[in-house]
């Protein structure tokens, strides 16, 4: 097919044949040139009598892979044999085989990712996630005291699974587990663990999730430091416990998880309470409560006894009698003061009466004096005679003396000298 035909747009009336499509794809892919690509090896297919070997290189975070084709001598001449799960960097050129319509990366160099480089990348990821706040204690979720059901993600038939289940059952025989077995190393570990984590997180019966694995090399534990897994754990609504390796092992998952356990056995102890210890604690609390109650009763009894010994309770009439005596004494004082006051006032009244009597008309009459009144003939009130003109001869008079009055008549008047 001419280049003019190849560059033209395909139509229902003029479609491209398969060979042309593959040719165009091959030309486009080959323009990419040589590339360095990082991933994890899987499905290494090497035959002694083959000149070419075929491998699968998987992405370390997502379920994405690419086929590798390389000379068998590159694999055979390596100082250490390649194995599934190895983290490597390959150098190759993308190739598209037009006849079969398949894509592969033609590899001419395979280099293992060094331990130092791996650790540096892990630390770089750790710093970046810490800066985002994924390690912040404030975002850590508290574990339930007694979980209804425990989710467990671990390798099938692994020692970690046996340790978690046996220790948990010994501590609390009624504990229930929801176990999902996944790959715990290699290229498929991260996507399988993430899928299991999401399934358990969506299960309403699961109250806490344990991700457990036994010890291993740095390469073996790499899945638990992959960013995709850290993001999934941070997004989970259910508390997650990291129980990876042994005490010295510190994958990034330990920092992101809500709780880090030193070992799978330690995880079981941290998640499931010990029924024997709880019973002992209950007995101790019961004893403390009883002792506290007895102490309170004893203190109240002592306080009541002290109150009973008070005089007011020993003889309730004592304060009443005391108040009665005080009232009687006050009444006596009041009576005495009133009597004295009355007598004083009586003496004063008698003295005033004597003074009034001495100055009054009766006293004057008693000394021989008399009061003469003229009685008018018109029947009006008598008038005291003070002049001779008031009693002409023939006037009727009344003379008041000390012991009575005398009726008389005026016989005549005489002017004073």
Swiss-Prot record:
Keyword set includes Nuclease: yes
A single GO molecular function term of this UniProt record: exodeoxyribonuclease VII activity
Compartment list: Cytoplasm
Pfam families (UniProt xref): Exonuc_VII_L, tRNA_anti_2
Main enzyme class: hydrolase
Catalytic function, reaction form: Exonucleolytic cleavage in either 5'- to 3'- or 3'- to 5'-direction to yield nucleoside 5'-phosphates
CDD domains, A to Z: ExoVII_LU_OBF
GO cellular component terms, semicolon-separated: cytoplasm; exodeoxyribonuclease VII complex
InterPro entries: Exonuc_VII_L, Exonuc_VII_lsu_C, OB-fold_nuc-bd_dom
Keywords: Cytoplasm, Exonuclease, Hydrolase, Nuclease
Parts forming coiled coils: none
GO biological process, one term: DNA catabolic process
Record family assignment: Belongs to the XseA family.
UniProt subunit comment: Heterooligomer composed of large and small subunits.
Functional note: Bidirectionally degrades single-stranded DNA into large acid-insoluble oligonucleotides, which are then degraded further into small acid-soluble oligonucleotides.
Protein name, as recorded: Exodeoxyribonuclease 7 large subunit
Naturally occurring in which organism (per UniProt): Corynebacterium glutamicum (strain R)
